[in-house]
Amino acid sequence: MLSQINAFLEANQTINVKTNEPLSKYTFTKTGGPADLLALPTSVPEVRQLLVAAKQNQLPITVIGNASNLIVRDDGISGLVIILTAMDQIDVQGTTVVAQAGAGIIQTSEAAYSGSLTGLEFAAGIPGSVGGAVFMNAGAYGGEISDVLTSAEILTQDNEIETLTNDELNFSYRHSLIQENGSIVLSARFEMAKGVAPTIREKMDELNALRAAKQPLEYPSCGSVFKRPVGHFVGPLIQKAGLQGHQIGGAQVSEKHAGFIVNRGGATATDYLTLIAYIQETIWHKFEVRLEPEVRIIGKKSE
């Protein structure tokens, strides 16, 4: 693969590309092995250029957002990893907000507030990117991205730019079509309603205070680990199983909110994954409830 990597680097000298880059520098858990190549494009043409070069050199492509709801395995990721955080422009026009994929959801909700637009208050404390939020239909406190998104501009596997409507994105709970078709979200368009700025700010502050009171924001974590199973809430299930505070290596079921796993220091991705599996097995054994990860898990599996 070394010759392929060298050829790729030769073709992309004008783009910020790092080799053997530890992804623990980027993930919210502070865990994860290296990427063979990590690219930080600043524009759509650069993204398209990267895809062309990767395909020419038969390099696998992985796109990640803000890495807030992500676990990268300790052996890292083969080929090219693209992080879009440098593509973070947000534009407010009337009641429409258009945000590039690398823009933060928090920053996008703040931009909406600055235009006295209501609808994204629920997202005021979600640490992910717009692209990641579209990818997984991120949500909190009764709201989801699909509630306000009208369309998304995507880059297909054939390197073609397309616009998909809300319906075409096939949203459901923590799911979108992007998870199935391998496309890259480039930007999202949100249609909002005019509101009263102080009321919007009050709601955002209220939800942020609730988040701070209930979530373990003082430690690195990957956010909500499991999807909510039908008829149950994850945190109480884990508490009832006696797993709150349970620790494997440096990864611990949060003592503040059992639906979170925090890095108490020196955790590895393997610690996280071992603890996740243990929780799943225990909950199934005790309650016959299957917990499905909400967190995205990627990277090379150990032999």
UniProtKB/Swiss-Prot annotation:
InterPro entries for this protein: FAD-bd_PCMH, FAD-bd_PCMH-like_sf, FAD-bd_PCMH_sub1, FAD-bd_PCMH_sub2, MurB, MurB_C, MurB_C_sf, Oxid_FAD_bind_N
Catalyzed reactions: UDP-N-acetyl-alpha-D-muramate + NADP(+) = UDP-N-acetyl-3-O-(1-carboxyvinyl)-alpha-D-glucosamine + NADPH + H(+)
Active site residues of this protein: 174, 224 (proton donor), 294
Predominant localisation class: cytoplasm
Keywords: Cell cycle, Cell division, Cell shape, Cell wall biogenesis/degradation, Cytoplasm, FAD, Flavoprotein, NADP, Oxidoreductase, Peptidoglycan synthesis
Gene Ontology cellular component terms for the protein in this record: cytosol
Pfam families hit by this protein: FAD_binding_4, MurB_C
Sequence intervals crossing the membrane: none
GO biological-process terms attached to the record: cell division; cell wall organization; peptidoglycan biosynthetic process; regulation of cell shape
Ranges for domain FAD-binding PCMH-type: 30-195
Pathway: Cell wall biogenesis; peptidoglycan biosynthesis
Obligatory cofactor(s): FAD
Enzyme nomenclature, EC number: 1.3.1.98
Cell compartment(s), UniProt: Cytoplasm
Entry GO MF terms: FAD binding; UDP-N-acetylmuramate dehydrogenase activity
Biological role stated in the UniProt entry: Cell wall formation.
Classification via NCBIfam families: murB, PRK13905.1
UniProt record similarity statement: Belongs to the MurB family.
Protein name per Swiss-Prot or TrEMBL: UDP-N-acetylenolpyruvoylglucosamine reductase
Provenance organism: Latilactobacillus sakei subsp. sakei (strain 23K) (Lactobacillus sakei subsp. sakei)
